[in-house]
Amino acid sequence: MAKAIMVQGTMSNAGKSIITAGLCRIFAQDGYKVAPFKSQNMALNSYITKDGLEMGRAQVVQAEASYKEPDVRMNPILLKPTSNRTSQVIVNGEILGNMPAGDYFKYKTKLIPDIMKAYNSLAEENDIIVIEGAGSPAEINLKQEDIVNMGMAKLAKAPVLIAGDIDQGGVFASLYGTYMLQSEEEKQYIKGTIINKFRGDLKILEPGLKMLEDLIHIPTLGVVPYMDIDIDDEDSLSDRFSNKNSGGDVDIVVIRLPRISNFTDFNVFEYMEGVSVRYITKPSQLKNPDLVILPGTKNTLGDLKWLRESGLEASILKYAAEGKPVFGICGGYQMLGKTLKDPWHVEEGGEISGLGLINAETVFEREKTRSRVKGQFHHLSGIFEGLNHKIFEGYEIHMGITTPLGGEAFTSSLEAMDGGVKSDGLCSNNIYGTYVHGIFDEGQVAETIIRTLMEKKGLVYEPNKNFNMVEYKNKEYDKLADALRKALDMEAIYRILNEGI
């Protein structure tokens, strides 16, 4: 069985996911078979495995850092919020159902057998499991029947490292308070603290580290600097979403819906020379972009109402009426149609009108479509005509069927992992919609779109032919590992790992 170590945090966004990924890469570099694990993740961004199962993206990143194929066992429970009080509960990659927070709180301990089956299975195949907590173990209102922080540490007999974010201020108080709010039994699991996101002179910080150690009698295992490392991380969303500047030759606007999901769909554009990607929430921020993207969402009906009430719907309709391109993905695709119907109350129930930019209607179904797919574009016209015959790959995660109302032809044929074939995508000159997440990741798709947009402006697109996304990601994981090796007492961490509980 594998040895285990766990990273918890004093708060959300303390850097647990990144530190976990970095430790995974370090252990893998040192020759160990390593796997990440998070018993329960709450996120709007998910991933479809090769088996067609759904898991959190943070564990996908950690799996990549471990040189492993993402495996649903790494994240047996995924909660996807559908409203402020309700989440879709996904267990072992399959939908269990929608639950209000109170009902899930009472139910969650029934999932411990699923958690431990997944954990023990991974532990049998690996040398080291790096476990990530969620939120903070100091949330004493959630301590009862905890399955993700100290509760998980006890189940796995895993020593715990507590990370605190000094960039937010109050790191000593948060580390001290987190420790003091644990029971005497739980305190025995905490073997070290980590100061994360530090900027400045370390010598000025050192007296505080000594005082903290004197107070809680737990060593500080390192001070991790604020790092400029490009890794898909939900903790860094605020940095990505805060970009409102249109600094590139091609300006792409993504509508930042309240429940935006799978934001990684647009990462590929951020690596392209001369392209800027902005996330906006107000009509005044729209300006005059070259492309508007309506992204996926975990609550299409609710976010469509928000789009309408915010005034962005009117702005998008005016933009589209000028012949400028709008691209919708998944929930964004559904919004582009004329009508959305929810007879089974998958979301809010009822019927609502869409933007009417595509002659189609969507009916929400109780069963989720969930598959990795390969496809090819055809029957495209207007600004997207250059995509015809291009190949793409991606994945579907949705609970609706979109049907053209006037006999319009679908614009792509999809082949699923099980060999099934179906149609997807609708185009109306400057408007395009698809259910496929990751559709831009195939280089020629993104490059064709950017080349077309540049040609409209009399510019020439020169692709970076030397760029390889897999190589780029691995270099970033290596940079992260190097930074953590320099910042952390890895000898002490290995000792903690080997001694266990």
UniProtKB/Swiss-Prot annotation:
Record-level Gene Ontology MF annotations: ABC-type vitamin B12 transporter activity; catalytic activity
Record keywords, A-Z: Cobalamin biosynthesis, Glutamine amidotransferase
GATase cobBQ-type domain span: 249-445
Matching PANTHER family: COBYRIC ACID SYNTHASE (PTHR21343:SF1), DETHIOBIOTIN SYNTHETASE (PTHR21343)
Transmembrane segment boundaries: none
Annotated pathway: Cofactor biosynthesis; adenosylcobalamin biosynthesis
Homology family: Belongs to the CobB/CobQ family. CobQ subfamily.
Stated role: Catalyzes amidations at positions B, D, E, and G on adenosylcobyrinic A,C-diamide. NH(2) groups are provided by glutamine, and one molecule of ATP is hydrogenolyzed for each amidation.
Biological processes annotated in GO: cobalamin biosynthetic process
Active site residues according to the UniProt entry: 330, 437
Name of the protein this chain belongs to: Cobyric acid synthase
